[in-house]
Amino acid sequence: MDGIGILGLGIGLGLLIYLSFKGWSMIPTSIAASLAVIITNRMNLWEAFSVSYATSMKNYAGTYLLLFFLGTVFGGLMGESGAAKSIAVKLLNTLGSGKGLLIVVLVSGILSYGGINLFVLLFTIYPIALVLFNNENIPKRLFPAAMLLGSATFSMVGLPGSPAIQNLIPCAVLGTNAYAAPLNGTLVSIVMFALGMFFLVRQQKRLAVAGIGFVPGSRDDLNKIRISQDDDLPHWALSVLPMAVLILFIFFTRNTLDTVYAVNIALSIGIAMVLCLFWKRIENPLNSINESASNSITALLNTSVIVGFGGVVQASSGFASVVDFALSMAMSPLISASLATGIVSAATGSCSGGLQIFLDSLGPKYIELCRAAGIPLEILHRVICLAGAGLDTLPHSGGFITAIVYTQLTAKESYKYVFFTNIVVTSIGCVVSILLFMALGII
């Protein structure tokens, strides 16, 4: 085992967290953190940056460039046209005031369970959340936690039938399906939702007592998000139409088109619909598109360089040692599988990455262990999904970085809330899942 290399991974990750909390840009932060890993793991400096870092970064940027651009344009036009505000007002009138956080969590969960990509979800919900948060004076720093609680916990790996890739990866190896351990997953999802909402509401109240409320970013137009009796807004049903078409297109093409390709087409259709329906309401469409292009590149680049850091980590000897250790733990199959998946997911910053590495390396072995111990593979499926999601949202997580950059927040402002909703809550969910099976036999 490479002790120095493993220590280097810890130093690199610690440096990444420290510098991002100190307000450093993601580019120098990722380079400094990568250097710590490269030096302690005795890697070739040029090869590490030109191959491991650069390849991971460019692959991510190349794959998601159009998605980030189109998603940012769609979200920008929804806000500029008043459609996002119209939807927000309808939600407030239907559910009542004081439900801003609940609305964001529920809508995020519903869209995620419907198969909507996290990035599309962010671009779609943020304009609506701005109106809700401004109207109820909810600190914007709670938005990433609310969105990620809805989209990356119970709806992604808890609820049976979720189309999320994280819930589908185990199927091929374990011979299970998306509905594995339905009662267990449903009960765990209720626990996660309740804990997350309790935490968010409590934090909102604590921030209010401290005098901290909604503060718009430099790109947030108060005139577009402030609710007034004099607002001339499009009808809410018309406003929902572009979103509905976008979501339905992704849903119905999920098995016939590449996911990213389908999302790009859906966003293009959504943009065309917004322009056709609300052209007269958009003051300067070209300016809105140009601003969105700049904003999308900033968000994409900041996320891509963190993925580059992840590429360096995965190429290091320390990472190989961490994976070997995680996959060699001898204890109850459910417990060792959950710990192994969680550790690898934390190292990669990816639930899907952790699941894939675990299943590729030890999937067949754990099938034998579970069968010998009388453990249904359905419960193994559910437990490792929860474990992977429990430790994948560290500060170098791509989803978290994109959320804070796009919303003009900082890790220092937002991460402690995300840490609870997406690491503490999901880890508790994993423990509850294991206990429900071991104590009550609930699958």
Regions found by a protein language model. Name each.
Residues 2-9, 13, 40-41, 173, ...:
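Long, contiguous bundles of hydrophobic transmembrane helices that form the permeation core
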Residues 8-20, 31-39, 68-73, 107-112, ...:
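Hydrophobic core segments of alpha-helical transmembrane domains in multi-pass membrane transport
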Residues 23-26, 61-64, 75-85, 112-124, ...:
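Short helix-coil transition sites and intra-membrane helix breaks within transmembrane domains
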Residues 28, 50-85, 110, 259-320, ...:
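Core transmembrane alpha-helical segments of multi-pass membrane transporters/permeases
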Residues 67-70, 94-130, 304-306, 329-368, ...:
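Hydrophobic alpha-helical transmembrane segments of multi-pass integral membrane proteins
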Residues 72, 86-88, 120-132, 161-173, ...:
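Re-entrant/interfacial helical elements at transmembrane boundaries that shape
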Residues 91, 293, 403-424:
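Interfacial loop-to-transmembrane junctions
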Residues 98-111, 138-155, 181-186, 190, ...:
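Alpha-helical transmembrane segments of multi-pass membrane proteins
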